[in-house]
Swiss-Prot record:
This is 33 kDa chaperonin. InterPro entries: Heat_shock_Hsp33, Heat_shock_Hsp33_C, Heat_shock_Hsp33_N. PANTHER family: 33 KDA CHAPERONIN (PTHR30111:SF1). GO terms for cellular component: cytoplasm. Keywords: Chaperone, Cytoplasm, Disulfide bond, Redox-active center, Zinc. The keyword Cytoplasm applies. Disulfide bonds join C244-C246, C277-C280. Under oxidizing conditions two disulfide bonds are formed involving the reactive cysteines. Under reducing conditions zinc is bound to the reactive cysteines and the protein is inactive. One of its GO terms (molecular function) is unfolded protein binding. It comes from Geobacter metallireducens (strain ATCC 53774 / DSM 7210 / GS-15). Its main location: cytoplasm. The gene is hslO. It is found in: Cytoplasm.
Length: 301
């Protein structure tokens, strides 16, 4: 069983559809799981905002999948953050990490500059494990490096589904994550241009997502705000949580995959090793007896 948090109690996602079937939308609050991830990774404020936006986007995209399917997002730019990697599944489990947790560029007004942290030049790669022989992979250039717009651009350009995404993370001066969440809206055939125009007007006029979340807006509240005047039905409410699938057994398999010669060299030169999971920062220590046991297992194959 991987590492997880009690954010399952407070973090959740709601999925709705317009009554005429032309628009689907999801909204979520992720304050607990984002706070836990940032604490584990020791992220500075701008890195926290970037990681929080990305894992929230991952949770929203994971909710579009079927049971057993997974999605991975990789943002890679030329900024000091280096990269963000997020994995999410259809059951509400999400995890993520950043290349440089201490990246902390600020704008001239003192606000967190996520785009500068990621860098203006780079790629967003989306990999979906749909249970087929090969995973589906799509790649687009970063659009604004603000994450929400990049995901909307990917969905619209690569998957050919007109989409709007809003993401927000509010980080307190002391580095604590006070609010995190977002929404994803997609236009479906038969497209209702009037309803889409109304939604885009609402999105254009709405305050920042972080402001609405700090006012106490729930996922239901975000959707009510966006869908004003558009009848819709709620399809699902699901819990979201930070869950890491790492385990000592998995790390053992990684060490075994090094092969007999490399594992023997590790045993002879160091006598022990420690492996840290990049997603949850859990440490796994393997002493001499552990390495000898793994080496004996390889020899017996």
């Amino acid at each position: 069983m991987g590492n997880s948090t009690d954010s399952i109690i407070t973090d959740y996602l709601v999925r709705v559809i317009a009554r005429d079937g032309s628009i689907r939308a999801l909204a979520c609050v992720t304050t607990g799981l984002v706070g836990e991830l940032c604490r584990r990774h020791g992220t500075w404020p701008t890195a926290s905002a970037a990681l929080g936006r990305a894992v929230t986007g991952g949770a929203l995209m994971g909710a579009l999948l079927k049971t057993g399917q997974r999605v991975a997002l990789r943002f890679e730019g030329n900024g000091p953050l280096k990269n963000i990697l997020v994995e999410a599944d259809a059951n509400g489990a999400v995890r993520g990490c950043v290349g440089n947790p201490e990246a902390n560029p600020l704008r001239e007004d003192g606000k967190l500059d996520v785009a500068a942290a990621i860098g203006q030049a780079g790629l967003l790669t989306v990999t979906k494990d749909l249970g087929l022989k090969e995973p589906y992979t799509g790649t687009v250039l970063l659009y604004t490096s603000e994450i929400a717009e990049d995901l909307a651009y990917y969905l619209t350009d690569s998957e050919q589904v007109p989409s709007a995404v809003g993401l927000g993370v509010f980080v307190e001066p002391d580095g604590a994550v006070a609010a995190a969440g977002g929404f994803l809206i997609q236009s479906l055939p038969p497209h209702n241009d009037e309803a889409v125009d109304r939604l885009m007007e609402r999105i254009g006029a709405m305050p920042p997502v972080t402001e609405l979340l700090r006012q106490g807006k729930s996922p239901e509240g975000l959707l009510e705000y966006l869908f004003e005047g558009i009848p819709y039905d709620t399809l699902e409410k699901r819990a979201l949580a930070f869950v890491c699938s790492c385990s000592r057994e998995r790390i053992e398999r990684v060490l075994i995959s090094l092969g007999r010669d490399d594992l023997a060299s590790l045993l002879a030169e160091q006598g022990e090793t420690e492996v840290t999971c990049e997603f949850c920062r859990e440490h796994y220590h393997f002493g001499r007896d552990d390495l000898e046991r793994l080496l004996a297992g390889i020899s017996a194959m």
